[in-house]
From Swiss-Prot:
Alphabetical keyword list: Acetylation, Activator, Apoptosis, Chromosome, Citrullination, mRNA processing, mRNA splicing, Nucleus, Phosphoprotein, Transcription, Transcription regulation
N6-acetyllysine modified-residue sites: 618
The organism's taxonomic lineage, starting at the top: Eukaryota, Metazoa, Chordata, Craniata, Vertebrata
GO BP annotations, alphabetical order: apoptotic process; cellular response to virus; mRNA processing; negative regulation of GTPase activity; positive regulation by host of viral transcription; positive regulation of apoptotic process; positive regulation of transcription by RNA polymerase II; regulation of RNA splicing
Annotated source species: Mus musculus (Mouse)
GO CC terms, sorted: euchromatin; granular component; heterochromatin; nucleolus; nucleoplasm; nucleus; preribosome, small subunit precursor
Post-translational modification Citrulline, affected residues: 678
Name used for this protein in its record: Ribosomal RNA processing protein 1 homolog B
Bias (Basic residues): 373-386, 448-461
């Protein structure tokens, strides 16, 4: 009886909000039939309260639907209910009650349910434009629809939630382009965006003004790059010439022209990323909307000049007016506003990408002029070429001829910063030995003008020192004969290279202080430079250092001998030549000329502190405690640990340890206060009194006896004052 008295709209709302999907599906099908049958007659129509009940049931029908595909299907079915209503007046009331329901229920939607209602708003707005399209975009129908949006959503008096209002502004032009992009004219489009012009002029919410400017007017400016060059006057002349067929033909031509322009814009890449996204969206949805930019600028200027327009709104509208005026004149939209920072950022990124593509073909001279910025790829190539030189060129390279003795200091100074060839000036005997083969042509060592990175200086300095320490046996024997001449030349060169030698000693502090203490190789085969078939001395091939086993003699160029002496930080950066042997300057030859061995071998690192025996400090004096009969301990450890009471001795008779059986007549049980009733385990035993209650013989009931003083003072522990 209760269900029979309820209205049909209430019953529909209950069944639409059911937790069972079958009940909801049947309710939606019956609602579709009910709306069609109720609005067929002219007299039969819905009231606002009845449609609010139906929309509330549809809202919760969408709420309980969880699967995404089923949500999209249900949103399509709900939005299609507008076309089931036969009365035009009931259709707009159906749309109005939808927006009222969304405003009322929006605050209770959580994040998980938000996307489905965004989709429902978009689809209902699209079907609302479909209603206008079926009515041939009549001006009266457009006015009625825009009044509903202005009253329920955009107006400040509507108190619509910001989420509903913002989402409507975001999807308005997109859905309008999807439905009427091929049919709407510039005047109709200007009328459809007129509510946003009014709300941008009179609202006091700065966020809403920015949202309208970005979501509506900035989109129109951005899509201007995708609109073909067809004037509004031509469209008007086509419309005035004849009726609908000419308009349809013009629309078809416009669609084809717009698609071609879109393809050209996207292919040439002349537009920004934001415009590209808008053009791609418009290409998928159809042809873009046509706007008369001069009419839009005039409308915005009119509302901006109103006295009731706030200053912030007027300033924002004036920037939009300048953009539309520039579009009307044929120029691109200026990028002076703060909203165009994103486009500037994208243009900078495109410019950087183009520069990086062109950077691969830049000449070396341009690299030097750019302030020392070298490309990463070229750095890697230079690094590989530094450690892995060409084998063919090294085989053909020979030691160059030595100039006169007058030019020796100059050549030494030029070769020192170069770092390409680590060859120093030879001795007088070495010059004579090379002069014997001067009749044969010797190829000149090529000098590369590549700039070296600063972090390679340690490596090159260490190579020069290592190569100077390994000398041929023949030169060492000859050096003893002409020691006087070599000492004079060494003194001349050492004065110019004194500063560099000090720096090398600082960097390689692990090497011995005096170079004379280093041993000289005394093998059977001399380690002289490699001689070719023609008698030309060639440089050996550079190889990377490899780990070697420890030997009895110390090789200055062997990295394994210097391993315990070189710090960890320098071991990572220094890579030495293992087989390369070059000639050295006379100063270094004289310093290394002696055949003495090292006085002290290099020691491995010991512990910082090492204690062989345990150290126990001895006290300065010892004072015996008063009234103590204990003897003085013998050792110092006994003085610190033992006290007079520590002389007691306790013994345990383990042979008398026996386990006793439990007996009820045990004397320990008889001594207990409960007597025979106390057993080992009695499950039926209960406590005599509670926790908060006291026994009859409580200490409070017994009289206090006078405190007795002890006859003798107890023996106390010694204090610190007893020892001093």
């Amino acid at each position: 009886m209760a269900l029979a008295m309820q209205s049909s709209e209430f019953q529909f709302a209950q069944r639409l909000a059911s937790s069972e999907k079958g009940v909801r599906d049947r309710a939606v099908r019956k609602l579709r039939q009910y709306l069609s049958a109720r609005t067929q007659s002219d007299t039969g129509s819905f009231s606002q309260e009845e449609l609010l009940k139906i929309w509330k049931g549809l809202f919760y029908c969408m709420w309980v639907q969880d699967e995404p595909l089923l949500q999209e299907e249900l949103a399509n079915i709900i939005s299609q209910l507008i076309h089931v209503v036969n009365s035009l007046e009931a259709q707009y009331l159906f749309i109005q009650t939808f927006w009222q329901t969304m405003n009322r229920e929006w605050q209770g939607i959580d994040k998980l349910q938000l996307d489905k209602y965004y989709m429902l708003i978009r689809l209902v707005l699209r079907q609302s434009f479909e209603v206008l399209k079926r009515n041939a975009w009549e001006e009266s129908q457009i006015t009625l629809f825009l009044d509903i949006l202005m009253k329920e959503i955009l107006s400040p008096e509507s108190q619509s939630p910001n989420g509903v209002r913002t989402h409507l502004i975001d999807v308005y032009l997109e859905e309008l382009t999807t439905v009427g992009g091929a049919e709407l004219l510039a005047d109709q489009n200007l009328k459809l965006i007129d509510p946003f012009c009014r709300i941008a002029a009179k609202t006091k919410d700065h966020t809403l003004v920015q949202t309208v400017a970005r979501g509506v007017f900035e989109v129109i400016v951005d899509q201007s790059a995708c609109v073909p060059q067809e004037s509004v006057e031509e469209r008007k002349t086509k419309e005035d010439g004849s009726g609908f067929p000419t308009k349809a033909l013009a629309c078809r031509k416009a669609v084809s022209g717009k698609k071609a322009a879109l393809d050209e814009c996207l292919r040439d890449g002349v537009i920004g990323s934001r415009e590209r996204d808008i053009c791609a969206a418009l290409k998928d949805s159809g042809s873009p909307l046509q706007f008369d930019y001069k009419a839009v600028a005039d409308r915005l200027l009119e509302i901006a000049n109103s006295k009731s327009t706030p200053p912030f709104n007027r300033k924002r509208l004036c920037r939009l007016v300048r953009k539309f005026q520039d579009l009307c004149e044929g120029n691109g939209a200026p990028l002076s506003s703060a909203e165009d920072n994103g486009q500037r950022r994208h243009k900078r990124k495109r410019k950087k990408l183009l520069e990086s593509e062109k950077g691969d073909t830049v000449s070396p001279a341009a690299e030097e002029d750019s302030g020392g910025h070298i490309h990463k790829k070229k750095r890697k190539k230079r690094k590989r070429s530094h450690f892995q030189p060409d084998t063919q060129n090294l085989d053909a390279v020979a030691v160059p001829k030595v100039p006169d003795s007058e030019s020796e200091p100059d050549t030494a100074q030029r070769q020192a910063p170069c770092g390409q060839a680590c060859v120093t000036e030879p001795t007088a005997e070495a010059v004579s030995s090379i002069g014997e083969n001067s009749s044969k042509p010797t190829p000149v060592m090529p000098i590369h003008n590549k700039r070296k990175r600063p972090r390679k200086k340690k490596l090159r300095a260490h190579k020069e020192i290592c190569k100077s320490t390994t000398l041929p046996q023949e030169d060492m024997s000859k050096n003893d004969a002409v020691s006087g001449h070599s000492q004079s030349s060494a003194a001349h060169i050492s004065s110019s290279e004194g500063v560099q030698a000090q720096k090398r000693k600082r960097k390689l502090g692990a090497l011995p202080d005096s170079s004379s203490d280093l041993p000289v190789q005394k093998s059977g085969t001399p380690t002289s430079p490699v001689e070719g078939k023609d008698g030309q001395t060639t440089l050996p091939r550079c190889k990377r250092s490899q780990k070697k086993t420890a030997s009895s003699t110390l090789d200055p160029c062997d990295p394994s001998s210097q391993k315990p002496a070189i710090s960890k930080k320098k071991k990572k950066t220094m890579k030495l030549m293992s087989n390369g042997v070059l000639e050295s300057n006379p100063g270094q030859i004289q310093a290394l000329g002696s055949n003495r061995t090292l006085k002290k071998p290099l020691k491995t690192e010991d512990d910082f502190v090492k204690f062989d025996t345990r150290f126990l400090p001895k006290p300065l004096f010892f004072r015996k405690a008063k009234n103590s009969s204990a003897t003085r301990p013998q050792g110092p450890a006994g003085q610190l640990n033992k006290t007079p009471s520590s002389s007691k001795k306790v013994t345990f008779g383990l042979n008398r340890n026996m386990t006793a059986e439990f007996k009820k007549t045990d004397k320990s049980i008889l001594v207990s206060p409960t007597g025979l009733s106390r057993v080992a385990f009695n499950p039926e035993q209960r406590p005599l009194h509670g926790v908060l209650k006291t026994a009859t013989s409580s200490p409070a009931s017994t009289p206090l006896s006078p405190m007795r003083l002890p006859a003798t003072t107890p023996k106390r522990r010694p204090r610190a004052a007893d020892f001093f």
